[in-house]
C-alpha cells in the first residue's frame, strides 16, 4: 500500500503517505492495492482508446466508463473490494474490445499495429489473491528509488488532478452531458500517465493541461445542472429538523435527489440535503417539492455523529463516505453509483423503493425543531445579475475587498483558521464561499453592505466555475487583470477535486492563492517553492498575518 492523495495522509520524518495495513481514511491496504491495479488497467484502456481514436474508432461506452471507474478511487468513495475488482475486470474487457477494433482499423488502413507499452499489455489476474499479488506492478511509487522525488510529486499532482476531473466528468455525464473531444484529451493524459515520465517540464505542462481540461468540464457540468434544474437563485434554507419520516441525501448527485423526490411524493416522507447537496435547494426545479424541507447536518467528516442521530434512511450519491459501522447505521445507509462500503446495500438503477421502505419503517423526527435559516444560491446567474450593484458599491467605496474562502472541509483543528478568517474579514468586504468548506462559517451572521449579503454561497466545489465567471466579468468591467482585482482566494483542500480546481485556477493564470491547512504531502519542498515563485501559491499561516498581506496593511 502507498496512498498519499488526501490531506489527512500520514506524515512522518521517515516519509509521507499511508503505507501500512490501513490508511487514515479507513481504506485497507488490500483495497488500496486493488485501486492502484484498477488505475493501471484504466490507463491501459486509455492507451488503446487514444490509438484507436487516431484511426477514427471511438467507443462512447469506454469514454464514460473510464472516468466513472477512476472516480471510484478518489478519497472516501469506494471501500468495497468486490466492486473495485468488478471495475478492473470490466476494464480488461473494454481494453480487449478496443485492441481488436484498433487492430482491425490498422488492417483496414493498410498499416501495422504499433507495439504498445506494458500498461496496455498487462494481463489481469482472475482472482482476488492473484490480483493482490500483481499490485506491486501498479504501485504509484514503485520506482521511487530510481527517480528524483520531484518527478514522483509531479506525477502524483497530475494523477490526482485528473482524478478530480474524472469525478466532474461523471457528474456531468449523469446529467446527460458528454463531449467526445474532452474524452479524447482525457484518454491521452491517462495514457501518458500510464507510461511514467521522468520529464519534469512535460509533467508540469500536463498538470496545467489538466487544469484547462477541467475548466471545460466544469463549464459542461454547469450547463448540465442549469439546463436540467434552472439557474440557482438566492434561497432561504432551514437547517433544522421537521417532524415526520425522513430521508437524507448526501454527496453531489442532483439527478438522484430528483428521483428520490419524485418517488417519495405523497408518501409522508420529508427529504433533506446533506453536505455538498445543500446547493440543490436553490435550483428552481427542486422548489416544487414541498417535502424537500431543508438541509440537515454539516460537512462530511461529521457524518458518523450526524447520521447516527438522523432517524431515517441515508443515501450516499457520491463522496464522501466513512465507516457507517461506527455510528451503527449501516443498515439504513445506501450507496449509489461509484460509492461502496462492504455490507452496505447498493442501489442499482433508478428505483429507490428499498430506501423509501426503510424510511417508512423508521421513527423519523418526533417534533419540529426551532428553525435556523441560512441563505444560499449565489451561483453564476445570480452573481452576474448582482454585478452592476456590486460594481457601484466598489466604486463608491462601500465594498473594498472580496475573499473567496471555501473548498473541502475536514476534521483537523487547524481548519478553525477558515472560521476565524471569515469572522475577521473587514466589514467592508464580501466573502464568497463554495464546497463543504463553507460549513466552517455558513451558519454565522455576516450582515450586508447596502443590501448585498456579505456572505455569498456560490454552491458546490465545482461551482468554482461561477466564481471564475464573476472574476472575469469584474476584471472586464474594471478593465484590469484578474490578479489586479481586490480579490483573494483562500482554499481549504482535502481531496482530489480540490486539487483539480486549484490546477484550473493556476492554468487560468490566477495568482497569489492561499491553501491550507497543510500543503499536499506529495508536493516536495522544491515543488512548493517553484509553485510559489511561478504563481504566488502559498500556504496559510495565521489569520492576522495573512489578512495584513492580503489587505496590504503595513
Curated annotation (Swiss-Prot):
SUPFAM superfamilies (alphabetical): Prismane protein-like
BP term (GO), one: response to hydrogen peroxide
InterPro entries the UniProt entry points to: HCP/CODH (IPR004137), Hydroxylam_reduct (IPR010048), Prismane-like_a/b-sand (IPR016099), Prismane-like_sf (IPR011254), Prismane_a-bundle (IPR016100)
Q: Name one GO molecular function term.
A: 2 iron, 2 sulfur cluster binding
Which NCBIfam families does the record cross-reference, listed alphabetically?
Answer: hybrid_clust, PRK05290.1
> What family is this protein classified in?
Belongs to the HCP family.
As for what it does, the entry says: Catalyzes the reduction of hydroxylamine to form NH(3) and H(2)O.
The protein's name in its UniProt record: Hydroxylamine reductase
Lineage, highest ranks first? Bacteria, Pseudomonadati, Pseudomonadota, Gammaproteobacteria, Alteromonadales
The record's gene field reads hcp
Amino acid at each position: 500500500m502507498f496512498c498519499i492523495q488526501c490531506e489527512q495522509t500520514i506524515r512522518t520524518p521517515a516519509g509521507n503517505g499511508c503505507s501500512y495495513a490501513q490508511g487514515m481514511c479507513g481504506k485497507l491496504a488490500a483495497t488500496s492495492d486493488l485501486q492502484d491495479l484498477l488505475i493501471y488497467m484504466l490507463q491501459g484502456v486509455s492507451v488503446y482508446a487514444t490509438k484507436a481514436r487516431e484511426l477514427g474508432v471511438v467507443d462512447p461506452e469506454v469514454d464514460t466508463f473510464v472516468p466513472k471507474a477512476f472516480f471510484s478511487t478518489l478519497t472516501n468513495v469506494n471501500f468495497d473490494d468486490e466492486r473495485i475488482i468488478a471495475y478492473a475486470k470490466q476494464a480488461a474487457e473494454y481494453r480487449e474490445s478496443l485492441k481488436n477494433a484498433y487492430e482491425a482499423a490498422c488492417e483496414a488502413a493498410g498499416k501495422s499495429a504499433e507495439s504498445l507499452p506494458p500498461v496496455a499489455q498487462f494481463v489481469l489476474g482472475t482472482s482476488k489473491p492473484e490480483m493482490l499479488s500483481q499490485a506491486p506492478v501498479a504501485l504509484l511509487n514503485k520506482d521511487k528509488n530510481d527517480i528524483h522525488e520531484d518527478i514522483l510529486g509531479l506525477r502524483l499532482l497530475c494523477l490526482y488532478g485528473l482524478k478530480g476531473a474524472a469525478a466532474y466528468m461523471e457528474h456531468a455525464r449523469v446529467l446527460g452531458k458528454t463531449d467526445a473531444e474532452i474524452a479524447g484529451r482525457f484518454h491521452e493524459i491517462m495514457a501518458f500517465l500510464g507510461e511514467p515520465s521522468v520529464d519534469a517540464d512535460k509533467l508540469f505542462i500536463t498538470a496545467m493541461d489538466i487544469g484547462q481540461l477541467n475548466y471545460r468540464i466544469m463549464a459542461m457540468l454547469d450547463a448540465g445542472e442549469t439546463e436540467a434544474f434552472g439557474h440557482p437563485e438566492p434561497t432561504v434554507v432551514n437547517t433544522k429538523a421537521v417532524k415526520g419520516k425522513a430521508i437524507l441525501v448526501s454527496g453531489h448527485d442532483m439527478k438522484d435527489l430528483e428521483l428520490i423526490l419524485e418517488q417519495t411524493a405523497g408518501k409522508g416522507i420529508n427529504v433533506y440535503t446533506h453536505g455538498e447537496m445543500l446547493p440543490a435547494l436553490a435550483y428552481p426545479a427542486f422548489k416544487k417539492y414541498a417535502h424537500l424541507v431543508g438541509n440537515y447536518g454539516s460537512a462530511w467528516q461529521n457524518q458518523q455523529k450526524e447520521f447516527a442521530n438522523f432517524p431515517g434512511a441515508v443515501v450516499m450519491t457520491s463522496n464522501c463516505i466513512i465507516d457507517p459501522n461506527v455510528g451503527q447505521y449501516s443498515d439504513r445507509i445506501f450507496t449509489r453509483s461509484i460509492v461502496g462500503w462492504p455490507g452496505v446495500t447498493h442501489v442499482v438503477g433508478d428505483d429507490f423503493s428499498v430506501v423509501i421502505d426503510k424510511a417508512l419503517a423508521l421513527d423519523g423526527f418526533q417534533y419540529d425543531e426551532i428553525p435556523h435559516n441560512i441563505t444560499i444560491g449565489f451561483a453564476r446567474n445570480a452573481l452576474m445579475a448582482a454585478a452592476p450593484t456590486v460594481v457601484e458599491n466598489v466604486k463608491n467605496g462601500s465594498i473594498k475587498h472580496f475573499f473567496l474562502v471555501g473548498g473541502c472541509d475536514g476534521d483537523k483543528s487547524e481548519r478553525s483558521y477558515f472560521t476565524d478568517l471569515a469572522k475577521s474579514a473587514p466589514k467592508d468586504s464580501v466573502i464568497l464561499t463554495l464546497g463543504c468548506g463553507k460549513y466552517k462559517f455558513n451558519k454565522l451572521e455576516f450582515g450586508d453592505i447596502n443590501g448585498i449579503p456579505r456572505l455569498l454561497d456560490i454552491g458546490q466545489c465545482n461551482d468554482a466555475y461561477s466564481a471564475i465567471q464573476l472574476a472575469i466579468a469584474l476584471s472586464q468591467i474594471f478593465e484590469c487583470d484578474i490578479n489586479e482585482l481586490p480579490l483573494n482566494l483562500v482554499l481549504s483542500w482535502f481531496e482530489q477535486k480540490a486539487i483539480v480546481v486549484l490546477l484550473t485556477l493556476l492554468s487560468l493564470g490566477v495568482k497569489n492563492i492561499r491553501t491550507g491547512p497543510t500543503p499536499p504531502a506529495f508536493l516536495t519542498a522544491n515543488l512548493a517553492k517553484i509553485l510559489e515563485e511561478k504563481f504566488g501559491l502559498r500556504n496559510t499561516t495565521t489569520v492576522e498575518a495573512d489578512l495584513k498581506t492580503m489587505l496590504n496593511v503595513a
